[in-house]
């Protein structure tokens, strides 16, 4: 393989590749979506060269196929990312991300008075984009927050 075609992060036989993640968001995605808790091998590249982004992060998860719903939740941090499903070292499906209608069990509500902090319920937010700003509305306290406020503690 010539130097020009050499992969910056090792290829995987089967699994999912999260590509075109803005530089610096990869670690947040690993933590928030608990990807580091899997027993499967994860290969990560930070600040890799990217023609479109300048620099990007890349996450490869072996033997794990992200669902469309899981992939779309990533759009909160990497709206231009793609999730590629790999089988026998080849891309068999490429998923362009879309903001999900809701996101459950990932974030904690920033409202300290919200019942989701004291009751055995999963967090649940409706997601909306208004004039380019992503807002998340808690199902329980009905307060709206920007995506960066909801995710700032991660």
From Swiss-Prot:
Residues that coordinate or bind Zn(2+): 109, 114, 138, 141
GO CC terms in record: aspartate carbamoyltransferase complex
Disulfide bond sites: none
InterPro entries: Asp_carbamoyltransf_reg_N, Asp_carbamoylTrfase_reg, Asp_carbamoyltrfase_reg_C, Asp_carbatrfase_reg_C_sf, Asp_carbatrfase_reg_N_sf
Record-level Gene Ontology MF annotations: metal ion binding
Keywords on record: Metal-binding, Pyrimidine biosynthesis, Zinc
Cofactor requirements of the protein: Zn(2+)
Note describing how the cofactor binds: Binds 1 zinc ion per subunit.
Claim: Manganese is one of the keywords in the record: no
GO biological process: 'de novo' pyrimidine nucleobase biosynthetic process; pyrimidine nucleotide biosynthetic process
HAMAP family reported in the protein's UniProt record: Asp_carb_tr_reg
Similarity comment: Belongs to the PyrI family.
Role played: Involved in allosteric regulation of aspartate carbamoyltransferase.
NCBIfam families the record matches: ATCase_reg
Self-association and partners: Contains catalytic and regulatory chains.
Record-given protein name: Aspartate carbamoyltransferase regulatory chain
Organism per entry: Aeromonas hydrophila subsp. hydrophila (strain ATCC 7966 / DSM 30187 / BCRC 13018 / CCUG 14551 / JCM 1027 / KCTC 2358 / NCIMB 9240 / NCTC 8049)
